[in-house]
């Protein structure tokens, strides 16, 4: 109580007393007359993100708020913390103050996209009657989730002034729903001696929180099969971009002394892309085969009708995108010409419309198009569900990535039933600032139709000569360096309008 009394009126609007957080603490008499805070927050910080910034943020938040409402994700997992707090809130259901805390509760998560996705997944799994909306502090490298909802891309300051400024934004932020996407992979149980469990990069032991085999008692389990499940909010990718991301993570773990600054990291990323065939297709890189060789792709629209999706043989990476920010704020979907949009039956890419945008890339040079005004990848489809049916014997493994978390996925060569399916699974609440780039289908301020002031691209064949891309840009910025020290999980979508301040050359690979 002493600390609460010493706080400014502003900070009191975020403060949660300990008795609300823990069953082991009793309410003090003075707390009975305390006004309910306008924006009570639980703060989760990945102390390994952003170099030393995560640890510094923990110290600042704990100095400003109740020490017990600020959590270090390296010490406590969010599922255990939230279960404990919500069990206590249930115990206090007849306490009017605690009830109002529960109704007004917000979550702040500081880390990279994987950390933010981790919190999103936990909140979804809890199936709360009043799920708290989430604000994201950009502490990673790409910071796609924070950028999509107006929280910025740059790592924040960690002093009192910076933290109070962020809290003020949280106080004013609006709640926006975004779609959850569920991913299911099923295959026959491998013969003795073979394992098809996902293989995480060496330095990401938590990354498979996002994608794991279901237990024998899970309703999704099927006898005679291995079933894996996961979820994402921003994107799922299959193919070369995931392969390079995986290689980068593994290389950094083996030789950390080589990854001391951003420029060296980016050069290494490019080198890995070259050696593995991402910049130039090669007969010597069978793992870089195109998507059509790996799998048959089907999509379903809202009416539930499945249809084959034609994938050009030049496409070697496919991205299923929900938010307007990919690889550090780039927009692979772009802004289709209105006439051609109508001809193809496309709709604006809202984050809560139950549709996901499917985009393809030929190689890293193709990705350079995103740096140009109106640049975009190959727009393949919008879908409510998408299914990949892997061809028997096509490969013994592939690479996948969800919201910045890559893994190597072994595949049985003698199985013709390997299937990955992505489907819509509810929504989660995000906090968005006035700079939010994501658009809601239910927001009256969101334009339903593109107008003449919008910049459109007429390049609907989704292609630019690779030589022209090289001549204009000289380097690829498509697939950014992933977050260091990330835990794991899920989602983000691409902005309807291009960011006019597209990355400076310091960010180009």
From Swiss-Prot:
Residues 490-500 have a biased composition (Basic residues). It is an enzyme of class 2 (transferase). One of its GO terms (biological process) is defense response. One of its GO terms (molecular function) is ATP binding. Residues 439-452, 468-489 have a biased composition (Basic and acidic residues). Residues 453-467 have a biased composition (Acidic residues). It catalyses: a 1,2-diacyl-sn-glycerol + ATP = a 1,2-diacyl-sn-glycero-3-phosphate + ADP + H(+). Residues 439-509 are annotated as: Disordered. Pfam families: DAGK_acc (PF00609), DAGK_cat (PF00781). Residues 36-187 form the DAGKc domain. PROSITE patterns: DAGK (PS50146). Keywords: ATP-binding, Kinase, Nucleotide-binding, Plant defense, Stress response, Transferase. Gene3D superfamilies: 2.60.200.40, Probable inorganic polyphosphate/atp-NAD kinase, domain 1. InterPro entries: ATP-NAD_kinase_N, DGK, Diacylglycerol_kin_accessory, Diacylglycerol_kinase_cat_dom, Diacylglycerol_kinase_pln, NAD/diacylglycerol_kinase_sf. Its EC number is 2.7.1.107. PANTHER family: DIACYLGLYCEROL KINASE, DIACYLGLYCEROL KINASE 5. Monomer. Phosphorylates the second messenger diacylglycerol (DAG) to generate phosphatidic acid (PA), another important signaling molecule. PA is required for plant development and responses to abiotic stress and pathogen attack. May be involved in the accumulation of PA during cold stress. Belongs to the eukaryotic diacylglycerol kinase family. This is Diacylglycerol kinase 5.
């Amino acid at each position: 109580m002493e600390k609460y009394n010493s706080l400014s009126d502003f900070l009191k609007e975020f403060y949660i007393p300990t008795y609300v957080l823990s069953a082991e603490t009793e309410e003090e008499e003075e707390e009975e007359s305390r006004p309910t805070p306008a924006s009570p927050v639980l703060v989760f910080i990945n102390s390994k993100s952003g170099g030393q910034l995560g640890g510094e943020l923990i110290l600042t938040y704990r100095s400003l708020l109740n020490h017990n409402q600020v959590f270090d994700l390296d010490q406590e997992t969010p599922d255990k913390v939230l279960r404990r707090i919500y069990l206590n809130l249930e115990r206090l259901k007849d306490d009017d103050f605690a009830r109002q805390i529960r109704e007004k509760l917000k979550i702040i998560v500081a880390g990279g996209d994987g950390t933010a996705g981790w919190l999103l997944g936990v909140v979804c799994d809890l199936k709360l009657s009043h799920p708290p909306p989430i604000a994201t502090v950009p502490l990673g490298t790409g910071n796609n989730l924070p950028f999509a909802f107006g929280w910025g891309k740059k790592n924040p300051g960690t002093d009192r002034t910076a933290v109070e400024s962020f809290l003020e934004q949280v106080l004013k932020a609006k709640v926006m729903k975004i779609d959850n996407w569920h991913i299911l992979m099923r295959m026959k149980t491998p013969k003795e001696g073979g394992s098809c469990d996902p293989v995480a990069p060496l330095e990401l032991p938590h990354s498979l929180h996002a994608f794991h085999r279901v237990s024998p008692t899970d309703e999704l389990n099927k006898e005679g099969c291995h079933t894996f499940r996961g979820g994402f909010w921003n994107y799922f990718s299959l193919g070369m971009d995931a392969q390079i991301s995986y290689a980068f993570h593994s290389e950094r773990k083996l030789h950390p002394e080589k990854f001391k600054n951003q420029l060296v990291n980016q050069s290494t990323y490019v080198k890995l892309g070259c050696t593995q065939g991402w910049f130039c297709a090669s007969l010597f890189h069978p793992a870089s085969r195109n998507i059509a060789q790996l799998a048959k792709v089907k999509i379903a629209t809202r009416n539930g009708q499945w249809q084959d999706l034609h994938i050009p043989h030049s496409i070697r990476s496919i991205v299923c995108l929900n938010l307007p920010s990919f690889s550090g704020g780039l927009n692979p979907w772009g802004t289709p010409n209105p006439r051609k949009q109508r001809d193809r039956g496309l709709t604006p890419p809202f984050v809560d419309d139950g549709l996901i945008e499917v985009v393809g890339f030929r190689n890293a040079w193709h990705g350079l198009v995103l740096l140009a005004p109106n640049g975009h990848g190959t727009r393949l489809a919008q879908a409510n569900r998408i299914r990949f049916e892997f061809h028997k014997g096509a490969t013994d493994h592939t690479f996948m990535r969800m919201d910045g978390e890559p893994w190597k996925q072994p595949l049985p060569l003698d199985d013709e039933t390997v299937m990955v399916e992505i489907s819509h699974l509810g929504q989660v609440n995000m906090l968005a600032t006035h700079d939010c780039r994501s658009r809601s289908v239910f927001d009256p301020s969101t334009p339903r139709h593109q107008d003449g002031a919008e910049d459109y691209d007429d390049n609907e064949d989704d292609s630019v000569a690779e030589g022209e891309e090289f001549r204009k840009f000289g380097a690829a910025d498509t697939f950014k360096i992933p977050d260091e020290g990330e835990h794991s999980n899920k989602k983000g979508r691409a902005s309807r309008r291009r960011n006019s301040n597209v990355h400076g050359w310091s960010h180009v690979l």
